[in-house]
């Protein structure tokens, strides 16, 4: 079993969105990916930590960085907070960061490097 997360806004977004999904100001993660502040949506997702399948799922977390630690829409800190939700329950957890103009949020799914990484992860080709 494998799962790919691409440009996930787990800890929230920094623009005008409902407060429940807005990223808290000055968000930081500890070494386990745990945010120093959590919005309501993240608190709900964090409750799933104890029921996430143990040692069954390989996880690939793809993030983009066009500069400034963001893909232009989702701050990297928000995407990286997935680590805490999954905790140490995943069979494996890997982050792949892509940089440059083709790492923009809306372009990640069209990025040839991302495609190669997905093919390798999902089908070992």
Residue spans of the language-model regions?
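Serine-dependent carboxylesterase/thioesterase catalytic core
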Residues: 1-54, 71
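C-terminal catalytic-base region of ester-bond hydrolases, centering on the histidine
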Residues: 51-125
